[in-house]
Amino acid sequence: MKDSIKQKLENLVERYDEVGALLGDPDIIADQKKFRDLGKEYSELEPVVICYQEYRTVIENIAEAKMLMNDGDADMREMAQEELKTAEAQLEPLETQLQKLLLPKDPNDEKNVFLEIRAGTGGDEAAIFSGDLFRMYSRYAERAGWRIEIISENAGEHGGYKELITRVVGQGVYSQLKFESGAHRVQRVPETESQGRIHTSACTVAIMPEADESEEVELNKGDLRIDTFRASGAGGQHVNKTDSAIRITHIPTGIVVECQDERSQHKNRAKAMSLLAARINSAQAEQFAAEQASERKSLVGSGDRSERIRTYNYPQGRVTDHRINLTLYKLDEIMEGSLDEVIQPLVNEHQADQLAALAN
């Protein structure tokens, strides 16, 4: 292990002990926010410190075994040889685990997200595929125990959606869905195609972490134009009687958001403001990521929604993720929400990128 990484680990052990002492300080205990923040830091440091303590123990065992191998007694040397073999086998997995624990944490990983799906090229077929993608993500969310709320929808003429915006609520949502942003391409024979020709259509998916109250974007009221209108779609007679739907335009950026999910104008406004904050944050993050990507080409995680990331080929039953050259002949299962086999390799690739950067 590099000396620079060892030094970083020693510093983290010191900080862990320091935070542990602070958590017993009556002044800290009296300050709820400070106590909560330190408690969070302590729990984040703990797995790193425990792993590093195991690593140090193994290093000591190796040194001790090597010393015993110089012993004159043959039985002692044989025992030391076995101990050395065992300890060295433990060392590499611990080093790998420590490096992964040292990887920079994405502060958005535990956040809820706004999931946007928009039909692109392909007309009606693209809108139908938007509906298929929404069903895929909904099934995946069900398996993960997440909740999906529809913020706004624009239905396609022959099924699916021209545009759909949802909020996905649950544990670790962003960490699992963040690599889904981009263009999703479908190749299949549309139901309306009499000649049996394969058509290619596309949809774009955007995954935006929901902003915390503490990091909510500062929005100047003078920069906002707020319009009310009557909600369309389900909701019974009530929908037609009140202008409960909200449209907010952020004039400096031209970003427009709508919410017509709730019957209450106040609730729709709150959701629309939250979506607007996420959109502005996401636009800023995309700009930063583009600047970073120009310096270091990363296969995964650019989050550019115009980038073609995946193809769903129905005649072949194939799903291909172009970023990591992953091909799976499990289209039916994936469209039913079995996304882990696609998502986990992307997470692994991202971690490999980070480990390479850490080693440098």
UniProtKB/Swiss-Prot annotation:
Pfam families attached to this UniProt entry: PCRF (PF03462), RF-1 (PF00472)
Gene designation: prfA
Protein name: Peptide chain release factor 1
Entry annotated with the keyword Membrane: no
Principal cellular location given in the protein's record: cytoplasm
N5-methylglutamine found at: Q237
SUPFAM superfamilies found in the cross-reference section: Release factor
Superkingdom of the source species: Bacteria
Protein source organism: Teredinibacter turnerae (strain ATCC 39867 / T7901)
Subcellular location: Cytoplasm
PANTHER family assigned: LD18447P
SMART domains: PCRF (SM00937)
Family: Belongs to the prokaryotic/mitochondrial release factor family.
HAMAP family attached to this UniProt entry: Rel_fac_1
